């Protein structure tokens, strides 16, 4: 729930409570829809948890619950508006909603085009959760990283990537040699199984996953694609470092 904005969480709870306490006034088909939504949101994830299913990498395995959450949150928002009878209360309510949504919109603008790494403010936002959860899982930030490499790497440069390399394979110039480093399990050091096999000079690229960005600490970081102070992907220059040695 830390990736769902707080106003929607509150509206979601209100929507559930409203439907429960107004059960007698609902048609049979409405009751059936509500039960299906609850099944989708709660029962299916509960089965996965109780069966000890392997769950990893944030919410991506439970994306199917979000449509149901959105429906019930909308019910909550609309019903609150309907309950308010006085005009000034309705205006105040809409104003509060607009203010709350404006904060969410501001955060999305700050994250663009990586809106999918959003964490709500009550959980501390992206900066507080970046070390606990996946951020740029799909490596979208490697697009900007590739642009930087194409612009700044001399012809014939070697690039070692410990991240999803498919993006770089498509975007890197043909004049740059790309090598993929296998990484060990979280907590191991060094994180690259074959990192010692790469002879400098080279550039090292890593997304924010496990401790991959901590590899080659002797090499200075020359580029970061970051949002809200969190580096999503980075480039380390092990070319300059090798020349100095």
List where the protein language model places each region.
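Membrane-interface catalytic loops of GT-C/OST-like multi-pass glycosylation enzymes that act
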Residues: 1-4, 28, 32-36, 48-66
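Hydrophobic, aromatic-rich transmembrane alpha-helices
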Residues: 2-28, 76-79, 188
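Transmembrane alpha-helical segments
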Residues: 9-16, 42, 67-81, 101
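Signature aromatic-anchored transmembrane alpha helix within multi-pass, membrane-resident enzymes
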Residues: 23-26, 30, 34-38, 77-119
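Transmembrane-helix signature of polytopic, lipid-linked glycan biosynthesis machinery
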Residues: 40-58, 105-113
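Repeat-solenoid scaffold signature
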Residues: 54-93
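Membrane-proximal, lumen/periplasm-facing interface regions of secretory-pathway glyco-
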Residues: 93-148, 165-169
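Aromatic/acidic, Gly/Pro-rich catalytic loop(s) in extracytoplasmic/lumenal soluble domains
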Residues: 177-245
């Amino acid at each position: 729930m830390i990736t769902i904005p707080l106003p929607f969480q509150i509206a979601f709870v209100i929507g559930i409570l409203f439907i429960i306490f107004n059960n007698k006034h609902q048609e049979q088909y409405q009751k059936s829809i509500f039960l299906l939504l609850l099944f989708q949101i709660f029962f299916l994830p509960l089965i996965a948890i109780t069966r000890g299913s392997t769950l990893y990498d944030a919410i991506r395995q439970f994306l199917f619950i979000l449509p149901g959450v959105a429906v019930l949150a909308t019910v909550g928002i609309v019903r609150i508006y309907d309950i308010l009878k006085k005009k000034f209360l309705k205006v105040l309510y809409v104003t509060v909603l607009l203010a709350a949504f404006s904060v969410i919109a501001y955060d999305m603008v700050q994250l663009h085009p990586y809106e999918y790494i959003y964490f709500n403010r009550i959980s501390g936002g992206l900066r507080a959760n970046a070390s606990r959860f996946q951020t740029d899982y799909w490596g979208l930030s490697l697009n900007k990283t590739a642009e930087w490499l194409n612009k700044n790497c001399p012809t014939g440069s070697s690039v070692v990537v410990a991240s999803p390399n498919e993006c770089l394979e498509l975007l890197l110039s043909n004049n740059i040699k790309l090598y993929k480093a296998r990484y060990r399990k979280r907590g191991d050091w060094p994180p690259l199984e074959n990192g010692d096999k790469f002879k400098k000079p080279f550039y090292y690229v890593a997304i924010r996953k496990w401790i991959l960005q901590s590899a080659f600490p002797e090499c200075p970081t020359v580029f970061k694609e970051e949002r809200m102070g969190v580096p999503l992907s980075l480039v380390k220059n092990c070319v300059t470092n090798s020349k100095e040695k």
